[in-house]
UniProtKB/Swiss-Prot annotation:
Chaperone involved in the maturation of iron-sulfur cluster-containing proteins. Has a low intrinsic ATPase activity which is markedly stimulated by HscB. Involved in the maturation of IscU. Keywords: ATP-binding, Chaperone, Nucleotide-binding. One of its GO terms (molecular function) is unfolded protein binding. This is Chaperone protein HscA. It comes from Salmonella dublin (strain CT_02021853). PROSITE patterns: HSP70_1, HSP70_2, HSP70_3.
Length: 616
């Protein structure tokens, strides 16, 4: 198998010259930066030896702090201390407030409905906050490496949509970083473990971080990483464990007032500390807001059991998509700090029937994989044999006549990818075509997600079916989609890059996939009906034009038979009987065969008129 070179053009390092690159795990709760030194990938610590950087920014009128210093201010200045900003990326203000009604921030909407956070430093959006975190990580890397970074690979959840991915790239650009690539977090973990273990076969990457959950099923073979399927939830993570435990402590302490932000932060801090302690101890003492009590691991397990079960349901769906049984999985890689929770490890082990891998620190493994990939992409390993194949989570396609969806790129297709299909005009003289880009697994437009619309104009006015429009879908390595439509005879074209303003709702992707299975039979029948109705409309449209042009070729009796057949077809096409519509179309075809032959003869005679036999 010939492998593609994935180094970017122009980035090959000169002999003996090493470029500085870093991998960044931009996490919901904590972030890390890593690099490759002396052939080994390692995360970079701060001056106090701490590798994790809390994804928290504290804003003041005269500046801001990032990380531990910012987190320490959270209880005293909650409104100006922004944490878990990753959850806000690519979402509308209404969406954020509906999902997280108890966030202690002062929100305002921008003109496009996106969130702005009112802080002492002014109105800030999630991209700006993320950029400040990235700047702190880049500064740590530059200081450790004694030079400016030539490029970075930043990891994102596999289920991040175009808006969320673009927001991440915008944040990096704002931070002054050159993004070599966005990399799915589970894929980064696979790189780290694949290089370390050298195993071949199917591996499951279970990634439960602070704010997101991802499950990826990968095949590793001879250094080739192929993602067979992905699943997960873009709004489920260890933060949810913390909030459930905080609410439980609130109930036990009898604290009814939710308006005191300081108490809110104290409760959350107590919950986080208790969760960490319960990973090693069976019981923990809690002292918060004047209340003292005891929480057991069993009580904590009861609180989070339903959430852990949700992750396993996503695992089951991903395995089904990949065509793999749990017993076929060689190893299960645990990623994310939340996988330290004993119940998580226990349930995952039971589900896959094997003890999960935790050899690499689950907090660091994603950053390490990103650093390895950055080292390759920046040109330090031009002869690397590693090829990375990501996939798109949902099918991409177009709306066609009758409200149908024509899939152009099926879900779980490896990226980057480009696919094209040819379409044609429906009406005589049609000079424009509306392109409606869809995402989803169902057969009808009403059951899929609309991504974008644009129009192709300047199509030559030809008979129906005469113009040929090639529509090309291209998904780049970051999962961003561009669609181009071109009329082949003239070369006129139009295109669009799909960047939805908001992200998918919780569970929307999983729900869309589940619905496609549940309604498969119903969808096929609906598609068959819609296709027959479109064909009926096409036949009637064509017949109307033919009768307008050449009705003189028919006798009164022949015209009556054709009109009756057309009227019958028009009537049955309003109903839902697929067979009746099909038979009515066949009847129109039968009644018009002689008419079609006469029109053909007439066209031939007109074409030959004035020409000699020799000329023919």
């Amino acid at each position: 198998m010939a492998l593609l070179q994935i180094s970017e053009p122009g980035l090959s390092a000169a002999p003996h010259q090493r470029r500085l690159a870093a991998g960044i795990d931009l996490g919901t709760t904590n972030s890390l930066v890593a690099t490759v030194r002396s052939g080994q990938a390692e995360t970079l610590p701060d001056h106090e030896g701490r590798h994790l950087l809390p994804s928290v920014v504290h804003y003041q009128q005269q500046g801001h702090t990032v990380g531990y210093a910012a987190r320490d201010n959270a209880a005293q200045d909650t409104a100006n201390t922004i944490s878990s900003v990753k959850r806000m990326m690519g979402r509308s203000l209404a969406d954020i407030q509906a999902r997280y009604p108890h966030l202690p921030y002062r929100f305002k909407a921008s003109v496009n409905g996106l969130p702005m956070i009112d802080t002492a430093a002014g109105l800030l959006n999630p991209v700006r906050v993320s950029a400040d975190i990235l700047k702190a990580l880049a500064a740590r890397a530059s200081e450790s490496l004694s030079g400016e970074l030539d490029g970075v690979v930043i990891t994102v959840p596999a289920y991040f949509d175009d808006a969320q991915r673009q927001g991440t790239k915008d944040a990096a650009r704002l931070a002054g970083l050159h993004v070599l690539r966005l990399l799915n977090e589970p894929t980064a973990a696979a790189i780290a473990y694949g290089l370390d273990s050298g195993k071949e076969g199917v591996i499951a990457v279970y990634d439960l971080g602070g704010g997101t959950f991802d499950i990826s099923i990968l095949r590793l073979s001879r250094g080739v990483f192929e993602v067979l399927a992905t699943g997960g939830d873009s709004a489920l993570g260890g933060d949810d464990f913390d909030h459930l435990l905080a609410d439980y402590i609130r109930e036990q302490a009898g604290i009814a007032d939710r308006s005191d932000n300081r108490v809110q932060r104290e409760l959350l801090d107590a919950a986080i500390a208790a969760k960490i302690a319960l990973s090693d101890a069976d019981t923990v003492r809690v002292n918060v807001a004047g209340w003292q009590g005891e929480i057991t691991r069993e009580q904590f397990n009861d609180l989070i059991s339903a959430l852990v079960k949700r992750t396993l349901l996503a695992c089951r769906r991903a395995l089904k998509d990949a065509g793999v049984d749990p017993q076929d999985v060689l190893e299960v890689v645990m990623v994310g700090g939340s996988t330290r929770v004993p119940l998580v490890r226990e349930r995952v082990g039971e589900f896959f029937g094997r003890t999960p891998l935790t050899a690499i620190d689950p907090d660091k493994v994603v950053a390490i994989g990103a650093a390895i990939q950055a080292d390759i992409l920046v040109g330090n390993k031009p002869d690397s044999e590693m090829l990375l194949l990501d996939v798109i989570p949902l099918s991409l396609g177009l709306e066609t006549m009758g409200g149908l969806v024509e899939k152009v790129i099926p879900r779980n297709t490896t990226i980057p990818v480009a696919r094209a299909q040819d379409f044609t005009t429906f009406k005589d003289g049609q000079t424009a075509m509306s392109i409606h880009v869809m995402q989803g697994e169902r057969e009808l437009v009403q059951d899929c997600r609309s991504l974008a619309r644009f129009a192709l104009r300047g199509i030559p006015p030809l008979p129906a079916g005469g113009a040929h429009i090639r529509v090309t879908f291209q998904v780049d390595a970051d999962g961003l989609l561009s669609v181009t439509a071109m009329e082949k005879s003239t070369g006129v074209e139009a295109s669009i890059q799909v960047k939805p303003s908001y992200g998918l709702t919780d569970g929307e992707i999983a729900s869309m996939i589940k619905d496609s299975m549940s309604f498969a039979e119903q969808d096929v029948k609906a598609r068959m009906l819609a296709e027959q109705k479109v064909e009926a409309a096409r036949v009637l449209e064509s017949l109307t034009g033919a009768l307008t042009a050449d009705a003189a070729l028919l006798s009164a009796a022949e015209r009556q038979c054709i009109d009756d057949a057309a009227a019958h077809l028009s009537a049955v096409a309003q109903g839902d009987d697929v067979d009746a519509i099909e038979q009515a179309i066949k009847n129109v075809d039968k009644q018009t065969q002689e008419f079609a032959a006469r029109r053909m003869d007439q066209s031939v005679r007109r074409a030959l008129k004035g020409h000699s036999v020799d000329e023919v």
